[in-house]
Amino acid sequence: NPVKDKININKNVDINVYNYIGDMVISKRNINTLDVSKLSSGVYMLQIIYENKSITKQIIKK
């Protein structure tokens, strides 16, 4: 499902967002809501870091 404005996460995490060419476009620490409203439409990689573990997910910004 495409994301429009915000991404909600159940726990406080560190998040890095990368564009399609690998440039980091957002980096936030200790958050549970990520505002993506200012990102251009497209595909991004979302790196979620929690308790020294890293998970990467693809998101589509609408």
PLM feature segments, named:
Residues 3-62:
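C-terminal outer-membrane/trafficking sorting elements
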